[in-house]
Amino acid sequence: MRGGAVTIHVKDRQIVAPGEFVGEQGRFRVEGQVFRVGRKYYSKVLGVVTVDEENRVVKVIPLKGKYFPVEGHIVVGKVVDIGFTSWEVDINSPYVAVLPVSEVTSRPVTISRNELSRILDVGDLILAKIVSFDLSKDPVLTIKESRLGKIPRGTLVEIPPQKVPRVIGRRGSMVSMIEDLLGVKLIVGQNGRIVVVGDDPQRVEIAVLAVRKIEAEAHTTGLTDRIKQFIEERLRS
């Protein structure tokens, strides 16, 4: 919903519950998941508030289906902008993450957008770790640790973050089974993003379909056996 100008009664990055008071008609324009009663606006959803002081816009973004950052989590991110000393990274969250140059390379780098774009460009996918986050500042990422870094190729699949544990399986059993049966690699982010890497397009497609099946049936029992049967049937057909 897009409303008229409001006087806001919430802070930037504040988490709001359904029915929580956001603001009333005044200086700011209200957008997103809100409803109006008289002159007052309330949140429709469990969401996070963003306040754009420059453009005088307050917005409620739903948290459902989005990833809430946690320090130590491994995430699949997409570079969306390049600054002078860092990259902005979409991590499937209401909060845009920051990847500083110091968390990418230890070698001296000429600080310029052109130089940074040679390391990571807009649209590149990365596997990164969240090293810090609180509600007062954006998540900070690193890719300096082993197995982290740019993901050069693969097919991106997005699922609700809460269903990622079912894709991984107990002690990684589900991921290992899919990889072994299909000869592919699954790069799994705790933010609901999975990259399927493989040389055979048909097997990559089967892996994607298997992930979608896990997503749809995550609440059921006996899922590992059904996924194995599903893959074996697809390979025979």
Curated annotation (Swiss-Prot):
Keyword terms: Cytoplasm, Exosome, RNA-binding
Q: Which Pfam family is one of this chain's hits?
A: KH_1
CDD domains assigned: KH-I_Rrp4_prokar (cd22524), S1_Rrp4 (cd05789)
Gene Ontology MF terms = poly(A) binding
Which intervals hold domain KH? Answer: 152-211
Q: Where is the signal peptide?
A: none
Q: Where is the S1 motif domain?
A: 72-144
The UniProt entry lists the main location of this chain as: cytoplasm
- InterPro entries for this protein: Exosome_RNA_bind1/RRP40/RRP4, KH_dom, KH_dom_type_1, KH_dom_type_1_sf, NA-bd_OB-fold, Rrp4, RRP4_N, RRP4_S1
Disulphide connectivity of cysteines: none
GO BP terms, alphabetized: CUT catabolic process; exonucleolytic trimming to generate mature 3'-end of 5.8S rRNA from tricistronic rRNA transcript (SSU-rRNA, 5.8S rRNA, LSU-rRNA); poly(A)-dependent snoRNA 3'-end processing; RNA catabolic process; U4 snRNA 3'-end processing
Q: Which GO cellular component terms are attached?
A: cytoplasm; exosome (RNase complex)
Q: Where in the cell is it found?
A: Cytoplasm
Family that this chain belongs to = Belongs to the RRP4 family.
Oligomeric form and interacting partners: Component of the archaeal exosome complex. Forms a trimer of Rrp4 and/or Csl4 subunits. The trimer associates with a hexameric ring-like arrangement composed of 3 Rrp41-Rrp42 heterodimers.
> What does the UniProt record say this protein does?
Non-catalytic component of the exosome, which is a complex involved in RNA degradation. Increases the RNA binding and the efficiency of RNA degradation. Confers strong poly(A) specificity to the exosome.
This chain belongs to the protein called Exosome complex component Rrp4
- What species is given as this protein's source? Thermofilum pendens (strain DSM 2475 / Hrk 5)
Lineage summary: Archaea, Thermoproteota, Thermoprotei, Thermofilales, Thermofilaceae
Gene name in the database record: rrp4
